[in-house]
């Protein structure tokens, strides 16, 4: 059976022109030519608002919603026009949109100052460092902090509490640690754990599939943070050798692109933990280098290098940012969590 019959509720239109006073009140049912059957397919695939559709490519939407590519292209164009996605905006318009960005506190004043107030939503932040440098501790702490009210540096609204999703590739999520950190913040540990959604990824394909599962879940709950720990582990193990490098990087690029879309659509923080390698030919300086190449470095708006220091302390160095200078902050990991 072809898809043509299942899409007959989509009406052909030469041009999709929509004049609206407030796009926030529009739904996918308002898209020109989208009937009940197509709308149901879109919702089942996790596309329940114009932004989620507008940031997709025709091929991806066709694959995920089981629609024809031509139909998907028309739906995407309609969503982009209705939600004003993809056109040129003035610098003032961009500045106004930036006001939607939230800052998630790390719980350490020095780190928050380093990051201009905290970890940004609508961005991918990369943490990289050797084992024991604090990457997993950071991810647990930020997950707990996301449950704090907005006025306390969290991402949780009283009427719409925040939820955090962990894509765990190395079996490092520890609910016991979440309980410790939540209690230290004065939060109910059981409630915090209920709002942490954890899935173990067993290979790179499963890891990418879990992003689609987060997308579907976001239609019913307030997803404010996605953690991938670690982002490169499976790709590094499965795509071995120079001959498979191009294929690995293509898949990794798509994975990061989908995470960025989730971040934009849900105004959420995306935190990816990355592994490192040592450059044997380094003659001077720190030989430690993040794995993943330019794909990860370009996808990450903020790159933070974690390393061990003396007396059990650790150093977070902001290596790259679109608007902040390089700098360092010193922190410690104690029973209650991260502290200055």
Where do the language-model regions lie?
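Phosphate-binding/switch region of NTP-binding enzymes
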Residues: 249-253, 257-340
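Long, low-complexity intrinsically disordered regulatory regions enriched in P/S/T/G and acidic residues
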Residues: 1-30
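A short amphipathic alpha-helix within small helical-bundle interaction modules
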Residues: 28-31, 42-64
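Conserved inter-motif catalytic segment of the P-loop NTP-binding fold
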Residues: 159-244
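Short, ordered loop/turn segments at secondary-structure junctions
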Residues: 58, 169-171, 230-232, 275-276, ...
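Amphipathic alpha-helical transducer elements in NTP-driven molecular machines
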Residues: 105-108, 112, 121, 136-140, ...
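The Walker A/P-loop phosphate-binding site
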Residues: 38-41, 78-191
